[in-house]
Design a protein with these regions (language model features):
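The serine-hydrolase catalytic nucleophile loop
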Residues: 34-44
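Gly/Ala-rich beta-loop-alpha elbow adjacent to hydrolase catalytic centers
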Residues: 99-103, 107
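Conserved alpha/beta-hydrolase
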Residues: 47-66
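Active-site nucleophile elbow and catalytic-triad environment of alpha/beta-hydrolase enzymes
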Residues: 15, 177-194, 200
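Catalytic active-site module of serine/aspartate enzymes centered on a nucleophile-bearing elbow/loop
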Residues: 234-274
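Active-site nucleophile loop of the alpha/beta-hydrolase fold
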Residues: 122-133
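Short beta-strand/loop motif that positions the catalytic acidic residue
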Residues: 198, 204-206, 210
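Conserved alpha/beta-hydrolase "acid-adjacent" motif
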Residues: 211-218
Length: 274
């Protein structure tokens, strides 16, 4: 990530998990590969302002070093998601799941496996397909999988964010362990054929200029194969991949909050009198 812009001292960034209080509805927020809960925090704050309980999970191996990310797999990431889901389930309110990039794929797996326990799903620039050159590269180097925890792929320029100020302060590793990249491709390949099993209401938000997870390939596949009878696509015009912190983050937060708010539990008469 290039931090050589004007400000030599970017502000301190909180990359830790967060739980924001609310009532009547809980939301599980899942960040992407090499990311941190920070990239879901603005969205979480806006949802909490609407009195939605929000839990931003930290996926296993993240918020640490590239070496730490190379020691885990998609099974560990999904375990982090399930732990977060169980934490919210204890409150007894309806739960929605919201995932960015790889987090969108993990959200889809949770929706498939939890069924009616989830009220709705939101996928933000989900990583079901990488660009063709990246897919071909990973396929070509797959025979080196035994060395995957010692091989790193460089992300030139850091995170794919259009807004320069947001890109400058965005935390995250710009070295991607080959093992983690292969785990993402395996996760996506396992979840894609099961999208038809998702029947919860679904919202998909994706940027047309996304170069990490191409808009046409991903949105066409998801909208065609998602089993939900109610599904909606929102296309962003200015942002790149990390849409929760990019130029249109306010619109993303507004669209998500409006969509999930209708799943809030209706207070009973006795509860309303308390």
């Amino acid at each position: 990530m290039d931090r050589s812009d004007d400000d030599p001292h970017p502000p301190a960034i909180d990359t830790s998990e967060f739980l924001l209080d609310g009532s009547g509805l809980s939301a599980l927020l899942i960040h992407g590969l090499t990311g941190t809960p920070y990239e879901m925090r603005f969205l979480g704050d806006q949802m909490a302002a609407a009195s939605i309980r929000v839990h931003g999970v930290k996926l296993a191996g993240h918020s640490e070093s590239p070496e730490a990310l190379g020691t885990v797999t998609d099974a560990n990431w999904y375990e982090s998601v399930v732990d977060g889901f169980e934490r919210l389930r204890a409150y007894g309110d309806p739960i929605v799941v919201i995932g960015l990039s790889m987090g969108g794929v993990l959200a889809a797996r949770l929706a498939i496996e939890q069924g009616e326990a989830l009220a709705a799903i939101v996928m933000l620039a989900p990583a079901f397909f990488l660009p063709r050159p990246a897919r071909m590269l990973l396929w070509a180097i797959r025979p080196a999988a035994k060395l995957a925890n010692r091989v790193y792929l460089h992300k030139p320029g850091g995170s794919e964010i259009h807004d320069a100020a947001a890109r400058r302060i965005h935390p995250g590793n710009h070295l991607l362990p080959l093992k983690a990249a292969l785990s993402l491709t395996e996760l996506s390949a396992n979840v894609r054929p099961k999208l038809g099993e998702i029947d919860q209401p679904a919202l998909l938000i994706h940027a047309r200029k996304d170069r990490t997870c191409p808009f046409e390939k991903n949105t066409r596949f998801v909208m065609r194969h998602l089993g939900s009878s109610r599904k909606r696509l929102v296309a962003l015009e200015e942002s790149y991949h990390v849409i929760t912190v990019d130029s249109e983050k306010e619109r993303v937060a507004r669209e998500v909050t409006e969509f999930v708010s209708e799943f809030r539990a209706v207070p009973t008469a006795s509860a309303a009198r308390c």
